[in-house]
Design a protein with these regions (language model features):
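A structural signal for isolated positions on well-ordered beta-strands in alpha/beta enzyme cores
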Residues: 4-5, 33-35, 89
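A short beta-strand-loop structural module common to alpha/beta enzyme folds
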Residues: 31-43
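Hydrophobic residues within alpha-helices
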Residues: 18-26, 105, 150, 154
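N-terminal beta1-alpha1 ligand-phosphate binding loop
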Residues: 2-27
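Short helix-loop-beta junction
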Residues: 19-32, 110-115
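Glycine-rich phosphate/pyrophosphate-binding loop and the adjoining helix
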Residues: 43, 117-163
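Generic structural signal for well-ordered alpha-helical scaffold segments
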Residues: 23, 72, 76-77, 155, ...
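Helix-loop-strand module that forms the ligand-binding subsite of alpha/beta enzymes
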Residues: 40-124
Length: 163
């Protein structure tokens, strides 16, 4: 059984919904075990025990959220050189753009020598005021379907040995 680790951080619920959608779809794929972890609790042992990854983060001030960055910081050197070539997918929950956060996360996982199996999935909530940015989010059904597709694709690819 191949293990898919989904690591996320969410302050307003948007990224959590995305990660849960990916996890639910991935869990439906035979031959794959899904481990959904919040960034604050995930660590190097989780990363080493997985065969593939989905990283899901909100974009805060044009960067990945602090707690997601903390996860990468805590895990980077303990797993460096030990997970080369493993597949990953990336999901960003953004207010308007998301490209800088995606670029930042991609640079980090490039250092780990991970292999992207899809373009980063950026979901824009269009939250532009302080009130809207801090408010609980509800991710649109069509965007959640994209998250499900990413999770299912990674799980199926791992189970079949395609990645």
């Amino acid at each position: 059984m191949k293990a898919l680790l989904i690591v996320y951080h969410s302050l307003t619920g948007g990224t959590r919904q995305m990660a849960e959608a990916a996890a639910k779809a991935a869990a439906a794929e035979p031959g794959a075990e899904v481990r959904l972890r919040q960034a604050i609790t995930a660590g190097p042992d989780d990363v080493l025990a997985a065969d593939g990854y989905v990283f899901a983060a909100p974009e805060n001030l044009a960067a990945v959220s602090g707690l997601m960055k903390d996860f990468f910081d805590r895990c980077y050197y303990p797993v460096l050189g030990r997970i080369n070539g493993r597949p990953y997918g990336l999901m960003i929950c953004a207010g308007s753009d998301g490209t800088n956060a995606a670029r930042q996360a991609m640079r980090i996982v490039t250092g780990w020598r991970l292999r992207a199996v899809a373009e980063p999935l950026i979901v824009c909530t269009h939250a532009q005021t302080p009130e809207a940015i801090l408010a609980p989010k509800v991710i649109a059904t069509n965007d959640l379907e994209k998250c499900r597709t990413l999770g299912a694709t990674l799980a199926a690819g791992l189970a079949m040995g395609a990645f």
